[in-house]
Amino acid sequence: MSVLVRLTSKIASLAKSGRIASARQVFDGMPELDTVAWNTMLTSYSRLGLHQEAIALFTQLRFSDAKPDDYSFTAILSTCASLGNVKFGRKIQSLVIRSGFCASLPVNNSLIDMYGKCSDTLSANKVFRDMCCDSRNEVTWCSLLFAYMNAEQFEAALDVFVEMPKRVAFAWNIMISGHAHCGKLESCLSLFKEMLESEFKPDCYTFSSLMNACSADSSNVVYGRMVHAVMLKNGWSSAVEAKNSVLSFYTKLGSRDDAMRELESIEVLTQVSWNSIIDACMKIGETEKALEVFHLAPEKNIVTWTTMITGYGRNGDGEQALRFFVEMMKSGVDSDHFAYGAVLHACSGLALLGHGKMIHGCLIHCGFQGYAYVGNALVNLYAKCGDIKEADRAFGDIANKDLVSWNTMLFAFGVHGLADQALKLYDNMIASGIKPDNVTFIGLLTTCSHSGLVEEGCMIFESMVKDYRIPLEVDHVTCMIDMFGRGGHLAEAKDLATTYSSLVTDSSNNSSWETLLGACSTHWHTELGREVSKVLKIAEPSEEMSFVLLSNLYCSTGRWKEGEDVRREMVERGMKKTPGCSWIEVGNQVSTFVVGDSSHPRLEELSETLNCLQHEMRNPETFGP
């Protein structure tokens, strides 16, 4: 074996074991480099997600004595696909043509895959149509099929699926998983039925997609259990992918007993299994159990760390999420855009502007600022911290804005009372070809409510129902009631609540009635407030909010006895008002304050300052007549 072959094999072995830095040292120390050695290093970077390193290495390869071949191009196109960088991908395609590899089957398949993952179906289809019919294989067809499914162009995908000269099981899975990703359970089940009637049998990936489709909505619990039963019958219950999807299904539904039973039944634990267990524990609120599993995991990759950071953030422990992010950076694990997005969401929950800006600087250095997931988190962070200019700038930096990007910026403008900017943004969103969803209209209606735009709000509400046929939800009704309530239109607010009473009452979320009761308190309408309170007592007999609002209403109108009676009833029912909580970041340190708490180390100094402020506020000379 020659020295060149031996060293190239060593690079591959080191990279496969995760020792990529050592692999690069061997690569840099080689006396000569052929194309195979370059490809081995390039492929290693691409597979490990080190995309910037892969791009830099490919650039070096272009100007070296060794020239890129079809394996080089497939590796760098895979990097472009993972980054979603269609602009760089087009440059690679131009280089492919100039280098004479435009007839290479692996390269063309990689081009279709790259364009598909970047949602550029026109370019993917052009590459496909430019290929000779005889040169296409199953991978070619499946890559084009995935491109259309990824872009949610279901009719075009179906045309490709029907046109395929020879279907394979993977094509069925692409169709099912694509519909599952969009929550189209009926389509998934219909395709699954057709698959059972064909020559192909479902595998663990098929069942995994079906379980994921059932996980999208709690109303699908019956279908989920049925799919699980079929999975057991077909002998796929022990497969890692299927097992993880079942675990995810039960945790998303909040079925703690079923989730724990699935956890205990896992015998062979892969890296994916460890991550799934941690995720499952976090989703059911078992943060201590998740931490225990984290420490037991033999290997901790970027997904493991990100799952912990995300889990702590969702469970309201943003400080612990930040600590884990710092520990991850110290451990030497290369962070990705998902990790940055997760820790930014944690900063948003705590309104930590200083920490968020430092993390923003780090992710710019790593080249992640253009990712939609990161950009959305940045917009949310700056908006919650009151810096709307930075939020708008972060929105502008997002390369490929998705629906979440537009919705997040829409909410940001709305919360800050910038109704004109919010409505203009909505117009730009429609002009960009982005279809609004239920969340979009919650943001629009909230904006109109906070800005007193009653007429515009009514038009938007009507457009949502008639033009876009979006199913009405409790949150939409609540926004409308809040809008009418803030404007003093209590009669209209009551009519709306009465009209949609079945929707409002049948939901476990009684925010609509609570909003109406709050409006009654604001405008001192005791009679309507008492009427609404009766509805809330029937719907939520153990919920203290309706009692607190009614008591405040009585007290605000000087009816102290009735207010005291309501408070007494709360005591008799064993209810307690949830104490208020606030926090502030000063000098990169977070201080938290809870009503009645006296544990803060600077309590005496803070009390003196508050007393001084209260004295000045009550002094008529402070503000003048």
Swiss-Prot record:
Q: Where is the transit peptide?
A: 1-7
Q: What are the annotated GO cellular component locations?
A: mitochondrion
State the Gene Ontology terms under molecular function: RNA binding
- Region annotation Type E(+) motif: residue ranges? 588-618
The domain of life is: Eukaryota
Q: Where in or outside the cell is it found?
A: Mitochondrion
- What Gene3D superfamilies has UniProt attached to this entry? Tetratricopeptide repeat domain
Keywords for this protein: Mitochondrion, Repeat, Transit peptide
The residue spans of each PPR repeat are 3-33, 34-68, 69-103, 104-134, 137-167, 168-202, 203-238, 239-269, 270-300, 301-335, 336-370, 371-401, 402-436, 437-471, 473-503
Q: What is its main location?
A: mitochondrion
Biological process (GO) annotations held by this record are: RNA modification
Q: Give the similarity note.
A: Belongs to the PPR family. PCMP-E subfamily.
The name of this protein is Pentatricopeptide repeat-containing protein At2g36980, mitochondrial
Native organism is Arabidopsis thaliana (Mouse-ear cress)
